[in-house]
Every structure is written in structure tokens, then in C-alpha cells.
């Protein structure tokens, strides 16, 4: 890849140059790919090489005598409180590439069983609706409306039914970006638009959902006073960066203050759901068992004659994990392998 610039005689607006030449980092090449076919080929090759080394070869080396791969779950590694997976990391099976997703096909249940996958739907946005008490967001969820399409309609000033797929995708980036404390610069990079346009999108977003702006500002102010962020369930995350003399560190601390209560609450909820589901499977004497947690998703190895019971347990255990102003929702699927179940 390092010779690409020379061989193609590329003239790159804003091309990043390092000590050894122009950067060939993925984010740089992705911007070039539409104009230079060889760059797209390089990115594809890198992706395939990563799939082979990390997942095809890497996972095969982790298979134990019982034919299974056993991961380790960690409760205290991530700052947000999410459970992480190591040796190997089974929460990191790729989802962006179709070929990467197909790696999930190699994960199969034992004979007489199937996989049942239950995934929270927009849990962080639902937590935001509850914690901010924004009436518009709460009302949209209670009416089971398309949140991203509603946001697009408001931000881009078009009737709901005329929102394009592109506008909806951009609105989705704004909705989730707000949760992560995204800046106008960060949003402009994500959407390939100017910083001015991104700032206008965010301003219109906060006009649409005014209580969210007040809520986020309040989180930062409270964290400055106390030195920590707190989840809905009272779990604290210290934020020493807020008292730093370095502007960049303070800005980072402010983003933590914005997103930790939301992300952390979602992490708390999935843990409660795991306990609920595990207890119910045990109390009802089922042979089905909880295998894996991947962020907002639970994977159950389900005996085929216990399918309806497990569905009921997942519905109750996950939806009942927290009492919010809006209902928790899950998407549930079954399959003969992890790919089909997802």
C-alpha cells in the first residue's frame, strides 16, 4: 500500500503524511477508494487477511477437547461497566462485512438444540428518553414510531412520509452520536459533510428534543461538582479528566460525563436481564442455557422442545429488567447456527 501513491501519481486533498510517507491507515484509504479502484482492492485484501488470521485461524486454535470455544467474561475492565470477553473475544465477531458475518455460521448448538438470539432494540436511546424525560422522544417510543425517521423529518424540514433513506441514515448518526457526546467535527467526519452543516444538524436536533440538551448540560455540570458520573442504578464512574489543566483532557471528561450515565445504565440493564434469564432457566428445570452476551444481545442454546418456554423467559427477563418511562423492546430470532439466529 505504501507504493500506491507513487504508482498512481495521486494528488490527495488533505492526504495525511507521516515520517515515512503518506498514511495508508484505513480511514485515509476509505476516503480514496471511490476514486481509485486499487485502493478498494487493498482494503478488501486487508479485510480478508484479518478475517483469516484473527477469526478463521485464530478461533480454530481456541477449540477445546469438547469441541467448544470457552471465552472469559470480565466485569471490571470496561470503564462504562459493560461486560467484556477475552481469550478469545467472542463479542468481536465482525458484523459490518457480509463475509465477516458468515463466520458465525461455524458456531452451532449441540444435537437436538438450536440457538435463540434476543437483542435489545435501541436500548441506549430508550434510556436517554427515560433519563432526559423529553416528551417528544417518550411519545414517539410509546407510539412505536420510527425514531430515526422522525428525527430526519424535523432536522431536514421534510414531511415524515417524504424522508429519504439517506436522510434517515444521517438522522440515525445524529441520534446515536448525541449519546456518545459527539462534536460537530466528529459528526461532519461521520457523514462526510462540512462542520457548519453538522453543527446545524445538531442545533436542529436539540430544538426538536429540547429536554435532551438540558439533560446533557446538567450531566456535565453535576459531574464537575461531584467528580463522577452515575448510572440510573447508582453506579459511579470517576472522571478525573474534568479537573485537568489540559483542554483536550477536559473535553474528553465532558464527553464521558455525557455518555457514561446512558451507556452505563444500558450495561446495568443487560446484566440484570442476564440474571433474570439465568434464574428462570434454572428454576424451571430447563436444559436450555445462556451461552453468550454480546453487548445488548443474549444467545441461548435452546432445546427444541423448550423453545416456547425460553421465548417467554427472554421476553419477561429482558423487558422486565428495568422500569422505564418507555418499554424495553427486544428482537428475537432462532436458527441452526449463530448466523441464522442473528
PLM region descriptions:
Residues 11, 70-72, 82-85, 89-94, ...:
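Structured core elements
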Residues 280-331:
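C-terminal structured "cap/appendage" subdomains that terminate the fold
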Residues 2-98, 114, 121-124, 184, ...:
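Conserved "right-hand" nucleotidyltransferase catalytic core of DNA-directed polymerases
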Residues 3-13, 19-24, 83-84, 103-111, ...:
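Short acidic (Asp/Glu) and glycine-rich catalytic loops that position anionic groups and cofactors
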Residues 75-160:
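Function-dense linear segments that define catalytic or interfacial modules
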Residues 80, 91-93, 123-126, 134-135, ...:
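Flexible loop/turn segments at secondary-structure boundaries
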Residues 70-71, 75-78, 153-286, 292-293, ...:
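Conserved catalytic core of nucleic-acid polymerases
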Residues 60-61, 137-139, 162, 257-266, ...:
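Short, contiguous acidic/charged loop-to-helix segments that flank catalytic cores in large enzymes
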Amino acid at each position: 500500500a505504501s507504493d500506491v501513491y507513487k504508482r498512481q501519481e495521486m494528488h490527495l486533498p488533505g492526504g495525511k503524511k507521516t515520517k515515512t510517507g503518506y498514511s495508508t491507515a484505513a480511514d485515509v484509504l476509505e476516503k480514496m477508494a471511490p476514486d481509485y479502484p486499487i485502493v478498494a482492492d487493498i482494503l478488501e485484501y486487508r479485510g480478508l487477511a484479518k478475517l483469516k488470521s484473527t477469526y478463521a485461524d485464530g478461533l480454530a486454535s481456541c477449540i477445546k477437547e469438547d469441541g467448544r470455544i470457552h471465552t472469559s467474561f470480565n466485569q471490571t475492565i470496561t470503564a462504562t461497566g459493560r461486560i467484556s470477553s477475552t481469550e478469545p473475544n467472542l463479542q468481536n465477531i465482525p458484523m459490518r462485512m457480509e463475509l465477516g458475518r458468515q463466520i458465525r455460521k461455524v458456531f452451532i448448538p449441540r444435537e437436538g438444540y438450536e440457538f435463540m438470539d434476543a437483542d435489545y432494540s435501541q436500548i441506549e436511546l430508550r434510556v436517554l428518553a427515560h433519563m432526559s424525560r423529553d416528551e417528544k422522544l417518550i411519545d414517539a417510543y410509546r407510539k412505536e414510531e420510527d425514531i430515526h425517521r422522525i428525527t430526519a423529518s424535523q432536522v431536514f424540514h421534510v414531511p415524515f412520509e417524504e424522508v429519504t433513506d439517506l436522510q434517515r441514515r444521517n438522522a440515525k448518526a445524529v441520534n446515536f452520536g448525541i449519546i456518545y457526546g459527539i462534536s460537530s467535527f466528529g459528526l461532519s467526519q461521520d457523514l462526510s459533510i462540512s462542520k457548519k452543516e453538522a453543527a446545524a444538524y445538531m442545533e436542529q436536533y436539540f430544538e426538536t428534543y429540547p429536554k435532551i440538551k438540558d439533560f446533557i448540560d446538567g450531566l456535565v455540570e453535576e459531574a464537575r461538582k461531584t467528580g463522577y458520573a452515575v448510572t440510573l442504578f447508582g453506579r459511579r464512574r470517576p472522571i478525573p479528566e474534568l479537573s485537568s489543566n489540559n483542554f483536550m483532557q477536559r473535553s474528553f471528561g465532558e464527553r464521558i460525563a455525557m455518555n457514561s450515565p446512558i451507556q452505563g445504565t444500558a450495561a446495568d440493564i443487560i446484566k440484570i436481564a442476564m440474571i433474570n434469564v439465568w434464574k428462570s432457566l434454572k428454576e424451571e428445570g430447563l436444559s436450555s442455557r445462556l451461552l453468550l452476551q454480546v453487548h445488548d444481545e443474549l444467545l441461548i442454546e435452546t432445546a427444541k422442545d423448550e423453545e416456547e418456554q425460553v421465548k417467554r423467559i427472554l421476553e419477561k427477563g429482558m423487558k422486565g429488567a428495568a422500569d422505564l418511562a418507555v418499554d424495553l423492546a427486544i428482537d428475537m430470532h432462532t436458527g441452526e447456527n449463530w448466523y441464522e439466529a442473528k
